From Swiss-Prot:
Keywords: ATP-binding, Cell cycle, Cell division, Chromosome, Coiled coil, DNA condensation, Meiosis, Mitosis, Nucleotide-binding, Nucleus. Signal peptide: none annotated. Belongs to the SMC family. SMC2 subfamily. Residues 356-365 have a biased composition (Polar residues). Residues 337-355, 919-932, 1216-1232 have a biased composition (Basic and acidic residues). Residues 247-355, 415-472, 701-946, 975-1037 form a coiled coil. CDD domains: ABC_SMC2_euk (cd03273). Residues 526-654 form the SMC hinge domain. GO terms for cellular component: chromatin; chromosome, centromeric region; condensed chromosome; condensin complex; dosage compensation complex; X chromosome. Essential protein required for both chromosome condensation and segregation and X-chromosome dosage compensation depending on its binding partners. Central component of the condensin I complex, a complex required for conversion of interphase chromatin into mitotic-like condense chromosomes. The condensin complex introduces positive supercoils into relaxed DNA in the presence of type I topoisomerases. Converts nicked DNA into positive knotted forms in the presence of type II topoisomerases. The keyword ATP-binding applies. This is Mitotic chromosome and X-chromosome-associated protein mix-1. It is found in: Nucleus; Chromosome.
Length: 1244
């Protein structure tokens, strides 16, 4: 690829459009006067290749590249691409490549805008630089470009700079640049990766954690919402179930109420009957109470006995006063008593004899008086002509006969009417029996069903009797069990409310049943609750509650479970919402330790210290009560803690060498042996846990007792469950059978057959009753007729017989009266005699008894004086017993009367109670009727509510079969409306809390974010892998660079020596590393003439140095040929012969490369294939291609020769000055590396 033409417009001195055409593919020369624009053509080539260092094209800014007065500069270069061997990558199909660059001036202060086009398409600076680099034309580090002054620069180069030229020739310079760019990019990428890591750690990872927590919370919200929906369904189902149960209960209560009303009516009638019976009993007892005769007799006897007792007491007192007199009188009384006893015996015998002798007379007098009374009544009846009727009244015989005849007539009429009625009933019965026979065939099926149902009822009753199960007692037990369960639930609810209200539910045991190992877990058996639920203060120790609260501390919040397995199940199942410490009861024995109790030595020392301050020491373990299964745990917690009143005492004991133990004051100050003290308890409004939970402890025995009773009932019910179920089934069957039987009987009774049977039964009963009345009336009529006959016979007797009977009765009466008169005196005398003797005997008995009592009393009084009168006391006691006996009889009578009065009072009260009960029963019946109305309304309301629920929640009908099924979703055991509300509210609160804490957008974006984060991490890993691979590649390329550099040095050094020897025979030049260094650290030029090596290039002449520099440059060009070489007046310091030699060498050795050389010397451009001449006229430059004649004329141009000579001299002088300046600088300063300037465009 070589330049075919150049087109300039507004670039530097080429103000007008200029076309430079037909460049040679090999040697091109440009000549012209000084200032005519030769170098500007070369600058335009550098400019289009994208040079960044404007100093190399003699400009400070882009504005200076635009012609004076212009606003835009255009440079277009056409390349010939017919040689495909060196064609740029991807452009092998093009024969011509056009590159154009435009500079446009912008507003003041905004610089210039530049743009590229490649084959008519816009391109970037980086793309164009890569395009030229691809063919070996790196304008920013060029080895193909030798501008004015480059020879001098090469001569003054340091070893490092010469090495850089070799590197550029070898191609490693671009690698170094790319390496630096890559290292810079790697540095930036590494910083970016670190920044990404930092962002991940500080922002993205926490945010992703938050996103995942939000997703977890959202999953939990979804689960809780589902659970809430289930709870809501259960709540609604429970209400619907309760409503349905209430309907059933209301129906039963309505039946009970109706039955109750009937029972109350019967009770009301029974009370009325009882009230009448009580009033009759009351009347009889009042008559008995009013009899006073017996009371008077017993009262007199009691007074007599009491008088005797008083007399004996008087005798006793007299004996005490005069003991000697009593002894003498006692002897006289003893003698008198002997005589009196003899007389008494005689009188008794006389009294018995008198009774035997006079008893006949007394009885005879009584019989005679009765006979006189009888005769008088019979005579009176006979005289009047009357008889005694059934009522005992005296009526005439005639009136009695008429009364009997009237009665007989009425009876005969009644018998006739009854017979007619009987005949009529008999005819009706026969007619009904015919109808019954006719209709029985029609009702045969109903009658058979009734018989079958009756047999079924009888069979079921027989089975119930054989079963012998008391269903009423079983029902009472079940009702009692339900009441116990309800009571336990209420008590536990009270405990739950108490625990939830104390310190925001700190000791409320709320946990979820573990989803795993359900068969191994029993809540009642395996979870005992918090330690705070199991311990309490001993009675009378409540003032130490604050100290106990401080001592136990966190132990109160530990959960007591049965075994380690249960603790592991609860922990693995995440049953609690926060971390909990488990205390397995099975490990209680392992918690025992010899260090959990306070040694006696310490306790004695503590008491000694406390006594000095009049304080008392109490062991904390003695203040609390706790169950044995956590004893070692409690001992480990408070076994060595003592309680005192004073903080000073607590400190002294805690810090004492002997007593040294933990101390707590009553108000809560905690003093430890290590010097840590915790302040007192200063919030009186906040009760200690053991005081606040005291109501729960008080209710626990009641709960346990009721639970034991409930368990016993449940066990008993479970044992009888089979019988109970069988009995209930039989009762249900019996009720069904009876209902069917009643239905069949109702059908039969309502049918024609039933009506006929019912009428037949009524008529038959009436007929039988009528026949019985006829028989009774006939019998009574016969008796009446017999009585009439007797009365008529009595009426028809003659008067003579009556008179004779009257005389007989008169005589008998007179005789009886005479007998009574005769025997009256004798009987009265006998009676008086017996009574007098009886009175005498009684009086003597009394006297004897009195004397005996006196004698005994006196004797007892004497003995009492001698032996404290024991006999007198005994006699007095006897008298008292007699008095008490009499008093007892009187009291019995009075008690009897009082009992009667009490009984009357009770009867009166019972009557009042019956009256009240009657009124109460009436009131109850009215209340029952009102209750019945209310129940009916309640039933209707419940039915309406149930229908409303069913209409609102249609799923209830589908799920109703699962209601109250144990273990199912709708298990209502222990379930209440308040519990359901609490569960729903708790779930709602949890859902709201979780929804507030999580962002739905985060959850929806989580998958995208995770994918992006994963993609970023994968890219980072790939970048990291590429980064490491790049490092390895750089290390490999560094090694290859050294190898390539050595190879390039050898090749360049060989060509350098040959070219320099060719230009300057008998001279040799070489590139060698400085002393003590390697090729990779720097190179310097060594020249020898005739085998003599020059120590420095300063020893050479200016021309020789120029030849050295040119030889080196040409050696570089030969090592790595480029498609294009640009040389700007490189022959300035050479004479014509050397210039011609260089031109000939270029033409001979570089015939595959295109050279564009600016020169003023004939020796150079005479060897060129194409020569261009520049001119400057009218303020702008032009360039023309010269033919053969023009070249001959140009060779004779004196001005051009003069300028070339001036240039040669100036060049030599400039080289000498630069050489001297460089030598001085090298002597004063060590060589420095040339700074590397990297433009931002390299990274696009």
């Amino acid at each position: 690829m070589h330049i075919k033409s150049i087109h300039l417009d507004g670039f530097k001195s080429y103000q007008k459009h200029t076309d430079i055409l037909d460049f040679s593919p090999t040697f091109n020369a440009i000549t012209g006067y000084n200032g005519s624009g030769k170098s500007n053509i070369l600058d335009s080539i550098c400019f289009i290749m994208g040079i960044n260092k404007l100093d190399n094209i003699r400009a400070k800014s882009m504005h200076e590249l635009i012609s004076h007065g212009g606003t835009k500069a255009i440079v277009q270069v056409r390349f010939d691409n017919t040689d495909k061997r060196c064609s740029p990558f991807g452009m092998e199909h093009l024969d011509e490549i056009v590159v154009q660059r435009i500079i446009t001036a912008q507003a003041t202060g905004k610089g210039c805008a530049t743009s590229y086009t490649l084959n008519g398409h816009a391109a970037t600076n980086g793309k164009m630089q890569d395009f030229f680099r691809g063919v070996g034309l790196n304008v920013n580090n060029p080895h193909f470009l030798i501008m004015q002054g480059r020879i001098t620069t090469v001569l003054n180069m340091k070893p490092e700079e010469i090495l850089g030229m070799v590197e550029e020739a070898a191609g490693t310079k671009m690698y170094d640049q790319k390496k630096k760019d890559a290292e810079k990019t790697m540095f930036l990428k590494d910083a970016k990766l670190k920044e990404v890591d930092r962002i991940f750690q500080s922002s993205i990872d926490p945010r992703m954690v938050k996103f995942r927590e939000d997703r977890k919370n959202m999953v939990e919200v979804t689960r809780l919402k589902k659970l809430k929906e289930n709870f809501s369904r259960k709540y609604e189902a429970f209400q619907y179930f309760q409503t349905c149960e209430a309907v059933k209960k209301s129906a039963k209560e309505i039946e009970d109420a109706k039955k109750g009303i009937e029972d109350l009516g019967e009770k009301f009638n029974q009370l009325d009957l009882d009230l009448k019976n009580k009033e009759d009993e009351k009347k009889k007892m009042e008559e008995s109470r009013d009899d006073q005769h017996e009371e008077a007799a017993l009262s007199a006897a009691h007074l007599s006995k009491q008088s005797i007792m008083l007399q004996k007491e008087t005798v006793k007192n007299q004996l005490v006063e005069t003991i000697n007199k009593l002894k003498k009188e006692g002897e006289q009384i003893n003698k008198s008593l002997s005589k009196d006893r003899e007389v008494l015996d005689a009188k008794r015998k006389e009294h018995e004899d008198s009774k035997a002798a006079n008893s006949k007379d007394i009885q005879s007098q009584s019989d005679d008086e009765a006979l006189v009374t009888k005769y008088r009544n019979d005579l009176e009846s006979l005289t009047r002509g009357t008889i005694a009727n059934d009522k005992g009244e005296h009526v005439s015989i005639e009136s009695e006969i008429q009364s009997c005849k009237s009665t007989a007539s009425q009876m005969s009429s009644g018998i006739t009417a009854a017979k007619k009625r009987g005949e009529r009933l008999h005819n009706q019965i026969k007619h009904l029996e015919g109808e019954k026979a006719t209709l029985s065939a029609r009702s045969k099926s109903d009658i058979g069903s009734a018989d079958n149902y009756q047999k079924e009822v009888d069979e079921i009753n027989k089975q119930l009797q054989l079963l012998g199960f008391n269903i009423d007692a079983d029902t009472e037990k079940r009702e009692h069990a339900a009441k116990l369960h309800e009571s336990i639930t209420k008590l536990k609810d009270m405990d739950t409310r108490l625990l939830n209200s104390y310190k925001d539910g700190r000791y409320a045991l709320n946990y979820q049943r573990p989803p795993l190992h359900i068969d191994k877990f029993d809540e009642k058996r395996d979870v005992f609750g918090y330690v705070a639920h199991l311990i309490k203060m001993k009675p009378g120790c409540e003032q130490f509650a604050v100290a106990a609260d401080i001592a136990l501390g966190g132990v109160l919040g530990n959960v007591v479970v049965s075994t380690q397995d249960i603790a592991r199940i609860l922990i693995d199942g995440k049953a609690f919402t926060s971390r909990k410490t488990m205390i397995p009861v099975s490990e209680n024995a392992r918690n025992a330790s010899s260090y959990n109790t306070l040694p006696d030595v310490k306790l004695r020392r503590a008491k000694e210290i406390a006594e000095k301050y009049n304080d008392t020491v109490t062991k904390m373990i003695d203040l609390i009560e706790y169950p044995d299964f956590i004893s070692n745990t409690i001992l480990n917690a408070v076994g060595q803690i003592l309680v005192v009143d004073s903080l000073d005492v607590a400190r002294e004991i805690a810090y004492d060498e002997v007593a040294k133990t933990r101390m707590i004051t009553r108000r809560g100050d905690d003093v430890r042996t290590n010097g840590i003290m915790t302040g007192g308890y200063n919030d009186p409004g906040n009760k200690p846990a053991l005081i606040a939970l005291e109501p729960m402890y008080a209710r626990r025995p009641q709960i346990e007792a009721q639970q034991r009773e409930l368990d016993a009932l449940n066990r008993e019910l479970q044992l009888t469950e089979a019988s109970s179920q069988k009995c209930r089934d039989l009762n249900n069957q019996l009720a069904t059978a009876m209902r069917k039987l009643a239905q069949v009987k109702t059908n039969i009774n309502n049918s024609e057959f039933g009506i006929v049977v019912r009428d037949l039964k009524v008529h038959s009963e009436e007929y039988e009753k009528n026949q019985a009345e006829i028989e009774a009336t006939v019998k009574t009529l016969k008796d009446v007729e017999d009585k009439i006959k007797t009365l008529e016979s009595m009426k028809n007797k003659d008067k003579n017989s009556q008179e004779k009977r009257k005389k007989e009765l008169t005589a008998l009466l007179q005789k009886a009266e005479q007998t009574v008169a005769q025997n009256k005196n004798r009987g009265e005398k006998a009676r008086r005699e017996v009574m007098l003797l009886q009175a005498t005997v009684e009086e003597m008995e009394k006297t004897i008894k009195k004397d005996e009592g006196i004698w005994e009393q006196k004797k007892k009084e004497c003995d009492e004086l001698e032996e404290k009168l024991p006999n007198a006391i005994a006699a007095l006691k006897d008298a008292e017993l007699e008095q008490k006996a009499a008093q007892a009889k009187l009291n019995d009578l009075k008690n009897n009367q009082r009992q009667i009065s009490t009984r009357l009072g009770k009867i009166a009260k019972e009557c009042d109670a019956l009256i009240r009960e009657k009124a109460k029963t009436k009131s109850k019946r009215e209340e029952k009727e009102k209750e019945l109305t209310s129940l009916q309304q309640s039933e209707a309301s419940n039915r309406k509510e149930a229908r409303s629920k069913l209409k609102k929640f249609e799923w209830l009908s589908d799920e109703e079969a699962h209601f109250n099924k144990k273990g199912g979703l709708y298990d209502f055991e222990g379930y209440t409306v308040s519990k359901g509300k609490d569960e729903i509210k708790e779930l709602t609160d949890k859902i709201e809390t979780l929804e507030r804490s999580c962002c739905i957008q985060n959850v929806s974006n989580l998958d995208t974010c995770e994918a992006k984060v994963l993609d970023i991490k994968n890219k980072r890993e790939r970048i990291t892998e590429d980064f490491n691979m790049l490092k390895k590649t750089i290390a490999t390329l560094d090694k290859k660079k050294v190898d390539e550099l050595i190879r390039a040095h050898e090749s360049v050094n060989k060509d350098f020596g040959q070219i320099f020897n060719c230009l300057l025979p008998d001279a040799h030049a070489s590139l060698v590393p400085p002393e003590g260094k390697t090729v990779c650290e720097g190179l310097e030029v060594k020249v020898s003439f005739g085998g003599v090596v020059k120590d420095s290039l300063h020893e050479l002449s200016g021309g020789q140095r120029s030849l050295v520099a040119l030889s080196l440059i040409l050696a570089m060009l030969k090592f790595k040929p480029a498609p294009l070489y640009i040389l700007d007046e490189v022959d300035a310091a050479l004479d014509l012969s050397h210039t011609a030699n260089i031109g000939m060498m270029i033409k001979t050795h570089f015939h595959h490369n295109q050279f564009i050389i600016v020169s003023l010397k004939q020796g150079m451009f005479s060897n060129a294939d194409v020569l261009f001449q520049t001119r400057f006229a009218d303020g702008h430059s032009t360039c023309t291609r010269l033919n053969g004649g023009d070249i001959a004329v140009l060779c004779q141009d004196k001005v051009l020769q003069a300028q070339a000579l001036e240039l040669t001299d100036a060049g030599k002088a400039k080289k000498d000055a630069a050489a001297k300046k460089g030598a001085q600088k090298n002597d004063k300063e060590p060589p420095k590396k040339k700074p590397i300037v990297v433009d931002d465009d390299d990274f696009e």
